């Protein structure tokens, strides 16, 4: 489903594939050769979303930009990136050739330099910068500029260093910050989506006609299979690293 938001509407390259059950709304630009799979949500709320060429957004991933009168958090994703199933990315800048695995979360103002990655369930927090080629291990937390990587049990320490509500919602971190953030965000969202309208157009790329005797071209399904293969290799590599770490601990 493709929706306009006021005068803003998505721009999808003619060679990109958008699944019928994906949702794209507002000032979103999707580059050549991209694949946006079923259930993915890409929404521009007051700031633009830009996705570079040959990037894959997998099932049920949520990509958002956010911007109001006080702060702007556009979302920029480079070329040849993979955003895995159920990943959540908002208001960040992601360079070329990055890998964002299943269930990862990347928050406002974060920056992933070229070739960096976030493994399963990893978090890149507000205003954090991952250096070129750097990786966040499974379920670990990256915070700071440049990033320091923390294990899951250090989450309270990271939280104590952050000013999440001030940075994201412009709300001071007092006792009622959660309630005030909800009220502020609700007002913003109602205004941002008040003029949403479903557009008739839908981008579902069809293969070019073949001449008699020609081999069939690679299909969208084959391309998705390659992406899944890459993700499985990533999982296997992480498991090997985990087992090696366990052996080292036992040996020590």
Residue ranges and their predicted role:
Residues 1-33, 41:
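Extended, small-residue-rich solenoid/repeat segments and analogous flexible loops
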Residues 1-9, 45, 53, 58-77, ...:
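Glycine-rich hexapeptide-repeat left-handed beta-helix
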Residues 15-17, 36-37, 79, 100:
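Short Cys/His-rich Zn2+-coordinating modules
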Residues 82:
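Short HxH-centered metal-ligating active-site micro-motif
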